Curated annotation (Swiss-Prot):
One GO cellular component, as annotated: cytoplasm
The organism of origin for this protein: Borreliella afzelii (strain PKo) (Borrelia afzelii)
Free-text note regarding domains: Has 3 domains, the large (RuvB-L) and small ATPase (RuvB-S) domains and the C-terminal head (RuvB-H) domain. The head domain binds DNA, while the ATPase domains jointly bind ATP, ADP or are empty depending on the state of the subunit in the translocation cycle. During a single DNA translocation step the structure of each domain remains the same, but their relative positions change.
Protein name as it appears in the record: Holliday junction branch migration complex subunit RuvB
Residues that, per the record, bind DNA: R315, R320
Region (Head domain (RuvB-H)): 260-347
Binding site for Mg(2+): T71
Keyword tags: ATP-binding, Cytoplasm, DNA damage, DNA recombination, DNA repair, DNA-binding, Hydrolase, Nucleotide-binding
Summary of the function given for this chain in its UniProt record: The RuvA-RuvB-RuvC complex processes Holliday junction (HJ) DNA during genetic recombination and DNA repair, while the RuvA-RuvB complex plays an important role in the rescue of blocked DNA replication forks via replication fork reversal (RFR). RuvA specifically binds to HJ cruciform DNA, conferring on it an open structure. The RuvB hexamer acts as an ATP-dependent pump, pulling dsDNA into and through the RuvAB complex. RuvB forms 2 homohexamers on either side of HJ DNA bound by 1 or 2 RuvA tetramers; 4 subunits per hexamer contact DNA at a time.
Amino acid sequence: MKDENSINFLSSNENYLYDKSENELRPKVFEDFKGQANVKETLSIFIRASKERDEALDHVFLSGPPGLGKTTLASIIAFEMNASIKITSAPAFDKPKDIIGILTGLDEKSVLFIDEIHRLRPIIEEMLCIAMEDYELDWVIGQGANARTVRMPLPKFTLIGATTKPGKVTSPLYARFGITARFELYSEIELVEIIKRNSIILNIEIEEDAAFLLARSSRGTPRIANRLLRRIRDIAQVTGSLVVTSDIVAIGLEMLRIDGEGLDEQDRNILRSLILKFNGGPVGVDTLAISVGETADSLEDFYEPYLIMKGFISRTHRGRKATEFAYLHLNLEMKEDNLNENQRVSF
């Protein structure tokens, strides 16, 4: 069951979850999966225990910012459990028959991965909750006085649900997951390990300091590190460089308008808008998002985690505020009242 055929996409619209360009770089076993040490350690224990009892792994809930490896880890879990996996996302379930067809097609101990699980429709979620707990499905046939309920048994399967918005997952659904894990942004050291591993796969020779420079610009996210590594490979190829040096990386980052802190042009637009349009804040996320042409979801899911981690933005009960570090990074002068306010917040 560990061959490529064990990975099944349920909708062509969901292939972004596992596109071919990323597939070659995805680790297949825990040993090759860098970072998220606590998540790997606990999951390894639970997987081993389940295999020793010859049982399906309990349902797993994965949360965290996008691009950190939730889909990859789901595939590794299936591999370690010697199980097949079906990959999809919540928006693919439009009608009850969609989830019924998928659940009844599962094998014993197989894995169903649902990304963006917070976006499930209520009727689909209700059916899924019953399936997760009782391994049965209630299906209503007919209408009105002739309606009757048919109960269908399901194989013991493992549902892996992933989301970037755990707060939007309802309590009844969340309670069905026996294992929960949160992904955190990766450290530079962890990203360097990922870059070195993937440079070998891509047949790239990269110097140590170049790998660190690339890691520093990857926003703590392996998906971004992989994307940048490919672009740097293009530059090295065109310039005739056999080895990726820090100079090559610097040229590439400048072309992509990524600065030394890993901020791209939109990151800087967010900080400039916060400082110049809203006097450093506080300002609500919806207002800030509109000012830079983003949705509140994209601002919260993609941009904010890194800006907060790097200390450029702080969250308060009144809204987002630019920190002193943000002013310094953009070479903007901080007004005295804002400076005093930031000092009060820091203490």
